[in-house]
Design a protein with these regions (language model features):
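Non-catalytic positions within long, well-ordered alpha-helices that form the structural scaffold/packing
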Residues: 47, 155, 212-213
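Mid-to-C-terminal alpha-helical segments outside catalytic/metal-binding sites
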Residues: 92-94, 234-259
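Hydrophobic faces of well-ordered beta-strands that scaffold small-molecule active sites
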Residues: 19-23, 54-56, 96-98, 104-106, ...
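Extended substrate/RNA-proximal surfaces in nucleic-acid metabolism proteins
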Residues: 66-185
Length: 259
């Protein structure tokens, strides 16, 4: 279906990460993949740039994507079976599990109260302990009151928090005091690889590099959605600045590999 992928140059630049911990390839549950075939083609492209494993992270965002954890788990189970039945001779990354990307919004607390949050588990080499990690995001349009309190409350409930793509929020700058305070609270940051290649524009690109330079970034994610994103990721794999960054920095993605 998308055979033009094969014509484009690619490098296994992201092999050191082992695992992509942020992608939207469960079909028809959010703004990500629209079909099994699209997911298969995108997964094949992700394998080509070095990923051995991927973690699906569907949106939980009120009112746009009112997903239910039980339904998502059932869809994921069926999707895994469909992938195995239709992969043919494709080389694909292994799917390790499924995690939610939860927006801090009016529906967030209901997911917390349900006791069914879909989280990561990994061993933090800095602290020598296994942690449960909750992936959260903020609105891309405007800052919401109480965002820091919502994150602090989760830590008090025993969760550690990963903030998705802080570089994409227009209300934070390269030296945001708010983000610095979150780091002091122990919040992990995940930057989008495509931000580093300018996919979302120059402002997000600059902040992505600045946050890494600040020592704030713990994870890199593809935030993969569709074929267009896959083409952009292939382009990013040949970006010399990104290749150098991958050689210079060590991220925690691989610590999710055994889960």
């Amino acid at each position: 279906m998308f055979g033009f992928f094969k014509k484009n140059k690619t490098l296994p630049t992201f092999a050191p990460l082992v695992t992509d911990m942020h992608c939207h390839l469960l079909p028809l549950v959010d703004d990500g993949s629209k079909s099994l075939e699209e997911s298969l083609e995108v997964m094949e492209a992700m394998h080509e740039v070095g990923y051995e494993q991927i973690r699906l992270t569907p949106h939980f965002s009120y009112p746009r994507y009112q997903n239910d954890e039980d339904n998502i788990l059932e869809r994921y189970k069926n999707f895994c079976s469909e992938v195995e039945a239709n992969r043919g001779d494709r080389k694909l990354p292994r799917m390790t599990s499924i995690t939610g990307e939860y927006q801090i919004d009016d529906g967030f607390q209901a997911h917390v109260d349900s006791g069914k949050l879909l989280t990561y588990h990994f061993s933090d080499p800095k602290q020598g302990a296994e942690k449960g990690l909750l992936l959260v995001e903020f609105s891309l349009r405007q800052k919401r009151m109480g965002m820091d309190e919502a994150i602090f409350a989760r830590t008090m409930e025993g969760y550690d928090v990963i903030l998705a793509h802080p570089e994409r929020y227009p209300y934070f700058n390269s030296h945001s005091q708010f983000l610095e305070q979150l780091k002091e609270q122990g919040v992990y940051f995940q930057v989008n690889i495509l931000s580093l290649d300018g996919f979302y524009g120059p402002e997000s690109q600059k902040k992505a590099f600045d946050y890494i330079e600040n020592g704030w970034v713990d994870f890199l994610g593809s935030d993969m959605h569709n074929v267009g994103y896959a083409m952009a990721l292939r382009h990013a794999s040949t970006n010399k600045k990104i290749i150098k960054l991958m050689e210079k920095n060590e991220f925690l993605n691989a610590k999710l590999a055994i889960n």
